[in-house]
Amino acid sequence: MKRNEEYCGLHKLKMEIFNVEELINMKPFKNMNKITINQKDNCILANRCFVKIDTPRYIPLTSISSSNIIRIRNHDFTLSELLYSPFHFQQPQFQYLLPGFVLTCIDKVSKQQKECKYCISNRGDDDSLSINLFIPTINKSIYIIIGLRMKNFWKPKFEIE
């Protein structure tokens, strides 16, 4: 685990994150050369996902603790299962959020007796999956907010030879 923390730039942080530069140093994406930085909104954008540092407008009432399972379409999933889902990684894309980044942040926060939350948001597309994560920082009102959008998550694709 220590190697993963060093890779993510989290080995010396205790979730003392206040701006987008500190988020960039945490290396949340596979290829940090292919990101878009929005300084105004303290946000890093990539293919169908974002990581930002901000005060959330609200955390939905449907949000659950990151340690809890979530039921989607009569199936139970852990957050790790959703993050590492083979459905997501089989999609052709140049960029994706590193699951290790998310799980390391959650681990750091849980050691401080704080709770991370996540929820599934319905965007109107039955085959897609949208996950929003809220990770508290050392500042009570500031969170790392992660939005992950997986297109065709529920669409089965088969190759028959």
Curated annotation (Swiss-Prot):
Induction: Expressed in the early phase of the viral replicative cycle.
Family annotation (InterPro entries): Poxvirus_F15
Keyword entries, A-Z: Early protein
Source organism, top-level taxon: Viruses
Family the UniProt entry places it in: Belongs to the orthopoxvirus OPG058 family.
Protein name as it appears in the record: Protein OPG060
Native source species: Variola virus (isolate Human/India/Ind3/1967)
